[in-house]
């Protein structure tokens, strides 16, 4: 059933606008505000984060426990699908990067800086245009990872509760209304990112330049303190072996190549999940 959910999620992601209608974060942000408004919780931020995160996770686990024994688990299928779709990232990075691609292709550096800040949240004080391109490349890899790969990884490994936990922590780590809870959520999210980020780096090596990735990043693979975003940005750059960039078509081609690397990695992951489902 897990692989069926993964296939349905992929179809919804690619061919439906249902995800945007499902993803409503108001209830979670409101609950964070309620927990953060209690002085005892802000004085003990780890306790506050646990009080915020555990109730929705326990409720989901209870519902799954009730529904899975009924009708061979078919009643749990819609719930799992709903949870995984909600847990996917917000927005569409490929669409968001479109104006940057257009400006870069026109060799409009000033316009590229503007749309990168406006649409991608990238703020770079760069002396060279290639520095901006490298940051946008890293943003593309990170957004694709946190929006899709990490959620799918945790769902396949530990089920919908883990996928939901990842997105709850991600939203808590990115909100600015409860800074104390945000700091603790970011630390816990770093732990959640450690394993799937390394798995994606290994898949980059398998579908890209294996020798370059292993030579350049072997030491960082086991380093706990290396941020996932930085590791993935370096891995994507090395796996595609970008030797040329700069304004114009070559820079845009590097973004296209990076996206194709992500697509090949997704195909590899789905193939692994399919084999896993057959063997279990």
Set out the residue ranges of the language-model regions.
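Hydrophobic N-terminal alpha-helices or hydrophobic patches in metabolic proteins across all domains
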Residues: 1-280
